[in-house]
Design a protein with these regions (language model features):
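A glycine-rich, aromatic-flanked flexible loop/lid motif
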Residues: 198, 254-263, 286, 471-474, ...
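Scaffold signal of the M16-like zinc-metallopeptidase fold and its non-catalytic homologs
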Residues: 44-48, 52-59, 74-141, 160-164, ...
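His/Glu-based metal-binding/catalytic segments typifying zinc-dependent metallopeptidases
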Residues: 84, 88-96, 173-238, 322-343, ...
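M16/MPP (pitrilysin/insulinase) zinc-metallopeptidase core fold and M16-derived inactive scaffolds
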Residues: 1-45, 51, 62, 92, ...
Length: 871
């Protein structure tokens, strides 16, 4: 109404300093969250969001673009639409097919029965009139929930809600979720999912699911969280242990534990990498474990350990991905939507007090397992089996449907379709009047980049002075401790190096086997981790800055996590053969199942693999070829003892080299706790058992790949990428290249690839680690045409008149992402890692300053130099 533009959401992303903007659709709610640190920006976004939500212009041509339409190609009808293609891509993932097919049976009648994103085979049935009717019924204040977090008062905000949107409405109908009709006996079903190729062995999923009572019962909700912890928290937990070691599956499944986000709770457990004939063994095995656990009291120390995890999770201030306030809002949203009190979800102290009272009865948790799992008839077992013909059948069904439509089309119908297609193209080509929308400008950008400052201390590690990076932060009673180890060059390039991080904390250490170590971690820490922080050198693309990170966190009264981290690394055990093979098998299976969601990342990685030392290393160690290598390795070590022994020898060599390598420490905590924690770290790490003998690593021959490649994965859409050699991040041209990527995305690629091409997403990016400039598309129905659009975007920049606001918008988005706040601990850890990789505060501020001063001439110059002249 107030902002009659075609796409207020994408246009406001560019005209804002937002730290988060998105829209989420669930089975019984849709949310429109946004966040910003700038008050003017908040007012702008609030006014546009309220106008879009409550006074939407639902243009039938926009429905055709975003939802579904028919166009004619060579005189024959074809389906097009952004969401249609998005859901084709989303439903390619086996985990999505598993969830939606299971929900279909677990919820026979309620809204959860349906795929809220839209099943691709049903989307063509949706009409514009149905969309408008749905909007009128649901998008009414009587059916809305407003949640805010920040320093504006509730009164002030409510006044704005009223003034900007709500005053024009009268009372409407409030919609309520309904309880599901309960099954009177368990159900067993078999469904299929699409796979490529004829090899169907070890590709079946088994899952058991139960429908539980309403999530509004806060005590039961926490009780079932404890049940989940007892059964599934770690590899020593009885149900997870059974599923990981059952012998008929390669890994636990993607659906595990309690889901309390719906009106009624559910409990899941399952396996993947299995075969159909094991369905009965799976069901009987799970039920036997549940019977064994429910038959006796649960060890109180185990319950205390799970309560420790709940307290740790409750205390932790996150916000490194989604802003902290929005995380809280989204956690409480399902409660509020279902007319419950979200404060009970955020503040679990009262629920913990109630639960502790119930725990006076040693059989309380055991009885919950008996009542809500064993004696609960609303149970669905699903066997999801691979079908190599399913994709072809779905495509044939779509073709047959379109052919039937085509046969009935009269010349008049065809003329109408052509006219609508032309009208949509004209609408897409007509620039919006941006003056209608509010904006912030470069004058609203903070003058300086906020960077957390730490202290550099020294402690004794292995009788040597060793740096300790200390950061004081408001961590709400939690400390974060890390060991940072400079990774030798031969180690970082070894494909075996990544395997070591899979083992750390998951195999035994010292006198503890892996089951004992798992339980210890749950009792005293938020887990133990090993990872790698890798960057290209700021001024040399042929060198890698590489640090190993050993990580833990815990409540400040639990120092044992510091001891446990050292033990798990220093005395990591390589003698648990079955466990090690099991962990590598799990990694391979989970990696395979996640491919279709990250196709654009793999495409960009492949395209830029030879443009820096780090790009080459990442492609060889984490790319699609590395997945094939891991699969072959798992097969070899399972069948051949000598191959297994060779693997362990290699891992031991890498472990020794890392023990020998130079170290630093990182501690993030509240100031009043720091001296005790520093002292404890020194006491623990003073003596380190290091084998000083030199070790040599095996050189693994890497294949020399082609310049142009296509990889086939199981999906009904494409992920396209082109890459061009660019410069190191310290080069003055890095800033213009960053702005160029945003400029081309906003000004050309979004329209060409998403709006006109029908892909769910697309754009460009400069990658300072790969030292490359990359174009990409995501869930894209096209192929060759998209590559032409990549090239056309450069010609558009060089050969058409450009508008000044486009440059400002591109710079604004980049600066907003640089200035985006994290959690208190996350900002400290980021600052420390930046220093390790020579991204000093001066370096970061210089880059930001360069971004703010990029000109249109700079963009045209770097586009010619890097995207045309080297082609």
């Amino acid at each position: 109404e107030k902002f009659p533009v075609r796409d207020p959401f994408f246009l406001m992303i560019r005209r804002s300093l937002n730290t988060f903007m998105n829209a989420f659709t669930a089975a019984d709610w849709t949310a429109y969250p946004f966040a910003t640190q700038n008050k003017k920006d908040f007012q702008n976004l609030l006014s546009v969001y309220l106008d879009a939500a409550f006074s939407a212009n639902l243009n039938p041509l926009d429905f055709a673009q975003e939802g579904i339409r028919i166009e004619l190609e060579n005189g024959q009808p074809v389906y097009k639409g952004v969401v249609f293609n998005e859901m084709k891509g989303a439903m390619s993932a086996p985990s999505d097919q598993l969830y939606h097919q299971l929900a279909h049976h677990l919820f026979p009648e309620t809204t959860y029965h349906y795929n809220s994103g839209g099943d691709p085979k049903d989307i063509p049935d949706l009409t514009y009139e149905q969309l408008v009717e749905f909007y009128k019924t649901h998008y009414h204040p009587s059916n809305a929930v407003f949640m805010t977090f920040g320093n504006q008062t509730a009164y002030e905000l409510q006044e704005q809600f009223e003034k900007l949107a709500l005053h024009k409405f009268t009372a409407g109908t409030t919609l309520y979720s309904k309880p599901e009709k309960r099954l009177t006996a368990p159900v067993e079903v078999t469904e299929t999912y699409a796979v490529d190729g004829d090899e169907l062995k070890d590709k079946t999923y088994h899952v058991l699911s139960w429908l539980l009572p309403q999530a509004s019962d806060i005590k039961l909700r926490l009780g079932m969280r404890l049940v989940e912890g007892v059964l599934l928290e770690n590899s020593a937990s009885p149900l997870r242990h059974y599923l990981e070691t059952c012998g008929y599956a390669q890994s636990t499944g993607p659906l595990m534990g309690v889901d309390d986000s719906n009106f009624e709770m559910t409990f899941y457990c399952g396996v993947q990498g299995s075969n159909p004939e094991h369905a009965e063994s799976f069901r009987d095995g799970v039920l036997n474990v549940l019977r064994e656990v429910a038959a006796k009291p649960i060890d109180s120390s185990l319950v205390d350990a799970i309560l420790h995890q709940i307290e740790l999770h409750q205390r932790e201030i996150n916000g490194d991905g989604t802003p902290y306030g929005l995380s809280l809002i989204l956690n409480g949203l399902s409660g509020a939507i279902h007319h419950n009190d979200p404060i009970q979800i955020w503040d679990v102290d009262s629920a913990i007090a109630q639960v502790k009272e119930e725990l006076q009865d040693p059989m309380w948790l055991s009885n919950l397992i008996q009542t809500h799992l064993l004696d609960n008839p609303h149970r669905v077992q699903m066997t999801l089996v691979p079908d190599a013909t399913k994709s072809a059948k779905e495509q044939e069904a779509e073709k047959a449907r379109l052919a039937a439509i085509g046969e009935k089309l009269t010349e008049e119908d065809k003329a109408e379709i052509i006219a609508k297609t032309k009208a949509l193209q004209e609408r897409q080509d007509t620039p919006d009047n941006l003056e209608l929308l509010p904006k912030v400008g470069l004058e609203d950008v903070p003058a300086d980049l906020h960077i957390v400052q730490g202290q550099l201390r020294e402690i004794i590690c292995n009788r040597m002075d060793t740096p300790l990076n200390l950061y004081h932060a408001g961590t709400n009673g939690i400390y974060y401790q890390q060991v940072l180890i400079q990774i030798p060059d031969d180690v970082v390039k070894s494909p075996y190096f990544n395997l070591l991080s899979i083992l750390m904390g998951e195999v035994g250490a010292g006198e503890y086997d892996y089951l004992e170590l798992q339980n210890l971690q749950t009792a005293v820490s938020g887990g133990l981790g090993m990872g790698a922080s890798l960057r290209s050198k700021v001024d040399d693309k042929d060198k890698i800055s590489a640090w190993l990170t050993l990580t833990t966190k815990s409540l400040t009264q639990k120092f044992d996590a510091i001891h446990l981290l050292k033990l798990a690394f220093e005395q990591l055990r390589f003698d648990e053969k079955e466990r090690i093979i099991e962990l590598l098998q799990q990694r391979k299976t989970r990696w395979q199942s996640r491919l279709s969601g990250a196709g654009h990342s793999y495409a960009m990685q492949i395209a830029s693999r030879n443009m820096s030392a780090l790009a080459q290393r990442d492609y060889q160690n984490t790319g699609l070829g590395a997945l094939n290598w891991l699969g072959e390795l798992v097969t070899k070590i399972t069948q051949d003892d000598a191959a297994y022994d060779a693997l362990i020898a290699e891992l031991k060599h890498i472990h020794t080299k890392l023990l020998q390598a130079p170290k630093q420490f990182l501690l993030v905590c509240e100031e009043h706790q720091s001296e005790r924690l520093v002292e404890e770290i020194q006491n623990v790490w003073d003596k380190l058992n290091v084998d000083t003998a030199a070790t040599e690593l095996t050189q693994v021959e890497q294949e020399n790949d082609n310049e142009h490649e296509a990889w086939l994965i199981q999906t009904n859409v494409q992920f396209c990428a082109s890459a061009y050699q660019a410069v190191e991040v310290s080069h003055p041209d890095a800033a213009p290249l960053m702005v160029l990527a945003a400029y081309l995305r906003n000004g050309f690629l979004h329209s060409a690839i998403r709006e006109k091409g029908g892909a769910y997403g697309g754009g460009a990016s400069y990658d300072g680690n790969a030292c490359s400039f990359r174009f990409f598309s995501y869930r894209d129905p096209r192929l060759a045409e998209t590559f032409k659009d990549f090239e056309a975007s450069v010609q558009w920049l060089l050969n058409t008149e450009q508008q000044p606001h486009q440059l400002e918008e591109a710079i604004l988005g980049l600066v907003a992402s640089m200035d985006k706040p994290g959690s208190p601990a996350g900002e400290a850890i980021t600052a420390c890692y930046a220093l390790l990789h020579a991204r000093t505060p001066t370096f970061r501020r210089t880059l930001r300053e360069r971004l703010l001063h990029v000109t249109l001439e700079d963009l045209q110059r770097v586009a010619r130099q890097y995207l045309i002249e080297q082609t």
